[in-house]
Amino acid sequence: MKTFAVFGDPIAHSVSPRLHNKAIADLALDALYTRVLLKDGNELINKFRFLKLNGANVTLPHKEFALNLADDASETAQKIGSANTLVLKNEKIYAYNTDAPGFLKAIANFKEAKSAIILGAGGTANALAYALKSQNIDVCILNRSKARLDKFKDHYECFSW
């Protein structure tokens, strides 16, 4: 049986196990998906290995730990600066960020865009900004607090209110 999990803090609210286990059942796969409350992001990889997971999703506040502690990381995850997916391959743990490619797939049928506004400067904003910029789309990020825009201001147009 393959075992998968989602790591986060808090995590009790996550519907990921319900969604993934429904898909697993519908596809008649020999697998299980669960959630893991992880207080200390430094323990992410140790917990992954201890639980003998085949893969995991990672949510707040551990995405940077996922990137920095994995054995290897995709170019996309490295450029974004965080990972939301861990995969075990040949005893090594690989980190990926699926937010950017997933977002691009979701907007693939949209009319050709020249510019986009991202509302909010949270964790996913960096992935979306990276994805849009990779498609030569001008990005503007709007956020209530100016401080959260600091990491974006060198690469994107930013405004706060």
Predicted segments with their positions:
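Short acidic low-complexity segments
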Residues: 41, 154-161
